[in-house]
Amino acid sequence: MKGTYIFLADGFEISEALTTVNMLRRGGINVKTVSIYDDRIVTSSNRIPVVADMAFGEFRASTSFGPCLPSDVMIFPGGMPGSSNLAAFGKLMDIMQQHYTEGGTLAAICAAPSVVLSLLPDLQGKRMTCYDGFEEALTTKGAEYVKEGVVTD
């Protein structure tokens, strides 16, 4: 997967998703929002409808897959049940696993590290953070929970 994408599912935390998009675009990064549905409209955890740049089918059709660079990024905002909806979408989780295996970068916010990234098969020794109370999903997979706002590993 080439590029930077932030994936949206119903119940996402709007501030985590759209503030991230805003800051990245201001910084010159061409980030695209992707609805995991056939429709571009996704509803936030506070019932605010948002129009994504593309629906999941458009993402699959327009994105080149293959060897990744660290600059190829998949971003998962938090929010509940948004994070659970992302994690339940098998096609996206398959792409995440492939992307991670090929050396692409994964970024997750708030609940998403525990709910989404914990689905990766090997977190042994990875330093990770998440929303308070969600640590167990990471530590049971061998990750080291770090109580910090931002962690890079």
Where would I find each of the regions flagged by the language model?
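Histidine-anchored nucleotide/phosphate-binding helix
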Residues: 19-21
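Active-site-adjacent pocket-lining segments in enzyme domains
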Residues: 2-12, 23-35, 39, 53-153
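A cross-family phosphate/adenosyl-ligand binding-site feature
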Residues: 44-53
